[in-house]
Amino acid sequence: MKVGIISINKYSKHLNFGAALHSYAFQQYLDKQGIDNVIIDYLPRFMKTYNMKYPFLSEQPKEKIKRFFFWLGYFFPNLTRYKKFMNFFDTKYRMTNCQYDEALLSKALFDFDTIVCESDVIWSPHSTQGFDNGFFCNLPSMRGKNKISYAACIGYTNFSEKRQARFRELLKNFDSISVREIQGTEFTQEYTDKPVVNVLDPTLLLDAEDYAKIAVKPKEKHYLLVYN
């Protein structure tokens, strides 16, 4: 069996620790189970106009100058952070060689038996663009494959009637459904006849020894990083 993993990971606003770690952890867990897998290098619809390296360039034209001065103080720290994140993805992830957006992904010829939509807030509809089809396995290239959600998150649940209907329809794509939060599990169950299971965040599938293998001892001392 070969598994394709799709989620928010490499492309997230504000270079999120959680986004980087959950897909890493899930891939490592599958490796431990002897399951062949690869992370799909997927650029979500809502990130196509966002510049992770130079965030101020993502602003509307009238806001760019004002936001430039806001970001000026963060320019070099953000650039350093960006490079470290990209290095993590390049060295710790096993990803597809090609970057896919929704249009390209819909035409992809994958040899996956199973697609897993994995963790993070992948089921939250964008304010203007709605749900991302890639995160619901709602693309032609994914037809005929086993489709699973693992620890998916919805975020806010105040859907319009139109989006409620769309959410119900998109859930039909999945063969198995699991959600990260209890509230999200209960909410999702209202929109499908399939059982919805509440599961652990992927980062908790590994133990301390697994993370110790990739930890880099900091040069600086006397501080504490809290990952919540």
Feature-to-residue mapping (PLM):
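Aromatic- and Gly/Pro-rich donor/ligand-binding loops
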Residues: V3-E169
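Glycine-rich phosphate-binding "P-loop"
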Residues: S149-T157, V197-D207
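Nucleotide-sugar donor-binding and catalytic loop/hinge architecture
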Residues: M1, D111, P140-G144, Y211-Y223
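A short helix->loop->beta-strand "cap" motif at the edges of active sites that frequently abuts
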Residues: R143-K147, D175, D193-K194
